[in-house]
């Protein structure tokens, strides 16, 4: 059980949302220029990005605006044929993937060993950590930061894989308070349930993770991370629950997900205390530490601010390679990120003449 430890002492696809840029290294342009390979070398060939995505993910991510900008910047996206050996395809500069399964993971690990010069986004072993909600938030709970302009923790939660009739007793032993958010153990599923009373708990279907519901004013902050870049958008979320709700509601309320792209809250008329974004320094240090600990460069964090506070935040979920198509201006952020990988680890390859996948 993650006990909801705090951090610091100081302060799962549609629609477009207004951009809120919150993090970029101040001297990013100077650093990029200093690290960049000779312009002639970059122009000599395209940057080839092989992608292995589900058809749904490919459609939402590889939108025309991304493909068009990528072509202008010399980036070519090529579909990977999962039925053929990876070594027989390419050559690739970068492999971008979001597939699960032991067979794919083994193929990719073997490819990484044979082609260490290719950047794989991200290592399969690191991705595994975010696919299981029992362990997903452990790194957040173990962070020990100081002077980060706020406190970050995780709600109390309990892993349940037992007979449903025994769940109320397990919840009581763990010291969790109702209502509880029930989440499937496997993070691929976005369906959530809210249980208001002990009887409701017996209607749940393990294995799952139970998480204390924290009132947060009905607003959630989606923090998108692409390498060193951070973007934040506000989304409408579940409303606050008061004592009256606990008394008058019973049963299990199911939700397809806590937030959705159509529920963008950036332009809504919100209480300023609810709408205020988490402090930039807090997000920067949190993202940096999670990148280091998780070994990932493409993920997002779902954060909430405890209602009635200004500096107490909770991370309630994380996702690998989230729906970047919903992130404002994602095509610019993502193409810049891909080019930065070449600037840091530039290696000359034969030209690639195949058509886009």
Swiss-Prot record:
Biological process, per Gene Ontology: inositol trisphosphate metabolic process
Sites where the protein binds Mg(2+) 1: 302, 317
Record GO cellular component, one term: cytoplasm
Keywords annotated in UniProt: ATP-binding, Kinase, Magnesium, Metal-binding, Nucleotide-binding, Transferase
EC number: 2.7.1.134, 2.7.1.159
Subunit structure of this chain's protein: Monomer.
PANTHER family: INOSITOL-TETRAKISPHOSPHATE 1-KINASE, INOSITOL-TETRAKISPHOSPHATE 1-KINASE 3
Family per similarity comment: Belongs to the ITPK1 family.
Protein name per its UniProtKB record: Inositol-tetrakisphosphate 1-kinase 3
Species of origin: Oryza sativa subsp. indica (Rice)
Organism classification: Eukaryota, Viridiplantae, Streptophyta, Embryophyta, Tracheophyta
């Amino acid at each position: 059980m993650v006990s909801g430890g705090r951090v610091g002492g100081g302060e799962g696809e549609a629609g477009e949302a207004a951009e809120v840029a919150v993090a970029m290294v101040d001297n990013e342009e100077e650093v990029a220029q200093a690290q960049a390979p000779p312009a002639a070398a970059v122009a000599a060939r395209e940057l080839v990005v092989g992608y292995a995505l589900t058809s749904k993910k490919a459609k939402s991510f590889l939108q025309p605006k991304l493909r068009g900008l990528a072509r202008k910047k010399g980036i070519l996206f090529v579909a990977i044929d999962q039925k053929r050996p990876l070594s027989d395809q390419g050559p690739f500069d970068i492999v971008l993937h979001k597939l699960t399964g032991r067979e794919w993971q083994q193929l990719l690990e073997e490819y990484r060993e044979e082609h260490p010069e290719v950047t794989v986004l991200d290592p399969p072993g690191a991705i595994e950590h975010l696919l299981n909600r029992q362990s997903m938030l452990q790194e957040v709970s173990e962070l020990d930061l100081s002077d980060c302009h706020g406190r970050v923790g995780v709600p109390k939660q309990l892993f349940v894989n037992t007979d449903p009739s025994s769940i109320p007793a397990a919840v009581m032993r763990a010291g969790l308070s109702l209502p509880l958010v029930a989440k499937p153990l496997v993070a691929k599923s976005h369906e959530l349930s809210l249980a208001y009373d002990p009887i409701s708990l017996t209607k749940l279907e393990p294995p799952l993770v139970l998480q204390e519901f924290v009132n947060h004013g009905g607003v959630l902050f989606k923090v998108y991370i692409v390498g060193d870049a951070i973007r934040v958008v506000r989304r409408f979320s579940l409303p606050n629950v008061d004592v009256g709700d606990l008394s008058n509601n019973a049963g299990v309320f199911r939700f397809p997900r806590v937030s959705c792209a159509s529920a963008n809250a950036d332009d809504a008329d919100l209480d300023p205390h609810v709408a205020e974004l988490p402090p930039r320094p807090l997000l920067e240090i949190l993202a940096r530490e999670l990148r280091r600990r998780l070994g990932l460069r493409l993920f997002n964090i779902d954060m909430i601010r405890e209602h009635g506070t200004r500096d107490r935040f909770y991370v309630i979920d994380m996702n690998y390679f989230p729906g970047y198509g919903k992130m404002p201006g994602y095509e610019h952020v993502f193409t810049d990120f891909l080019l930065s990988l070449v600037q840091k680890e530039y290696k000359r390859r034969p030209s690639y003449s195949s058509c886009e996948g």
